[in-house]
Amino acid sequence: MNHRTDLRSLALLAQMTQSISRNLLILAVLLIAVQSSALAQQLRLTNPLKIDRGDEVVDIPLAEITQHLHISAAQFQSIIAINNATMQRIPTQLFSNREGAQPDTLLLLIRLPANGMLDASFHLDNSAPQQGSLVFGRAVPERKDDFAWENQVVAYRIYGPALEATGEISSGIDVWSKRIPNFVVNSFYKQDHEAAVTHNPAFSYHKDNGIGLDSYDVGKSRGCGGTGVWTGDKLIASRNYTAIKVISSGPIRFAFEISYAPWLANGKFVTETKRVSLDAGSHLNKIVSTYTFGGDQPIQLAAGIAIHHGADVAIPTTENIAAVWDTPQDASAGRIATGFVALPAEHAKALTAANHALMIVQRRSGEPFTYFAGAAWSKADMPTQADWNSYLDNFKQLREHPILAAWIK
């Protein structure tokens, strides 16, 4: 290497050193600025399990936010959360646990490794960019009153009164499989319309176009988490939904309430209201089903997962879990994984009967039944039956041992 080359190398090294120093200075200034603007206390979130937690939503009461951060309700809309380790913004959402009420909870979407910990600081920033939504749902009047909802990994739909008027009666939950994080509800309905107009089934959302498809057969079954009254040998279910209220449209939790008209079940008229919520990244809906009926005696209710011909079913004898490795309508579409989880406090019993995996409980009028039901796809992020069984088992453990939240200075 000659003298001129040495000088060029030294000059280049000096420039790189200056650039690194300048970037470090900028980072330090930003760090100081963020820290100096932080509100009174920080929130420490701890995973008590030796299981990785990915895309999990933590609910923090706004009463705690007011108490520990010393801010008013008028400032809630301006609050942002920062991961202190990465200095990245944590996705958040103001959420109300009561339909029509003011928000009472701050939702945080985080990931934690096994036995991991995350410290979050909070700031008020009216100029922060709007967060992109990770959940979506809407009524679909152009498709006979369907209602569909989704997140990054799965989509669902239920059927409304306009479809019932054609003679198609179903209160089961349909599954749409997808392999991309983008929303598919609008594009699938557009495909369905184009297929009908052109009489070309190649456009149908029942065909996998590289994004996903609808290949799940609901019919009059409970589909993926519908309910009914259990008589001991059969399910007596409602007709299509009659009304829906959207409670929250995101960006990290989509929630809505479904109402059903009264129906006669085992000699008794009953009505049902379901509250359904789907969090970003989760395969499972949280469903709170409440039946009302006359009298003081309890009745047996069941949440069901349809079992189609050729499906494999796993129900651990000591767990409130049912995992179905199901067969799609299109044999080339792999397998559709469906299942549900109920926590021990629900006193539910899992069994198979009437071509369903069932979660059976006893409830008096007005007593809620809470469970989780959902689906995945072998051609997306759930390639094997063992993966699905493990997912449901881990899901149950994570709900039984939630993330620990503590305020620190």
Describe the function of each predicted region.
Residues 23-35:
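Bacterial N-terminal signal peptides
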Residues 41-137:
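Alpha-mannosidase-like glycoside hydrolase catalytic domains involved in N-glycan trimming
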Residues 197-279:
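Extended, loop-rich substrate-binding clefts of extracytoplasmic carbohydrate-active enzymes
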Residues 272-274, 278, 283-316:
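Acidic (Asp/Glu-rich), glycine- and aromatic
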